Amino acid sequence: MIYGQDFSDRMIELAQEKMPNAKLFQGDFSNGLAEPLLKQKYDAIIATYSLHHLTDSQKVNFLKNLLMLLNEGGCIYIGDVAFKSREALEKCRDTVGEGWDDDEIYFVYDELKLHFPTMQFEQMSDCAGLILLK
């Protein structure tokens, strides 16, 4: 079974058309997951280009809550704007210049790893990475 949550009613509608059996909910995850999602256990939880809207402390709390929803052996997969270090983030910010979005709080692996020692990270491009958390 596929479960999901999105802020946009339109995205929920489009996803439901492609996955008619999925259980999808509209809601702002910065206020928490929809109640029915909290009653399930998951083999995998996937978040793509969304968690950068949370502050670093909100990310830590949110990820800790997601970890409690995993089945044994489950994994959280996060694809987002992400960097191995603060230095790499600053280098990218300098390169991008005025195109940089200061309203978004991007992942810095070296800093988040302090809260999640088993976290894994793979840089996928100059500004995107894959984070795995078990």
Show where each model-derived region lies.
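Short N-terminal helix/helix-N-cap motif within the alpha/beta-hydrolase-1
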Residues: 55-59, 86
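Class I (Rossmann-like) S-adenosyl-L-methionine-dependent methyltransferase catalytic domain
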Residues: 1-36, 77-134
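Local beta-strand N-terminus motif with an aromatic residue
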Residues: 42-43
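A short glycine-rich, Lys/Arg-flanked "PGG" loop and its adjoining helix->strand segment in the class I
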Residues: 60-72
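Short catalytic micro-motifs in class I SAM-dependent methyltransferases
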Residues: 49-53
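A conserved beta-strand element that flanks and buttresses the S-adenosyl-L-methionine
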Residues: 46
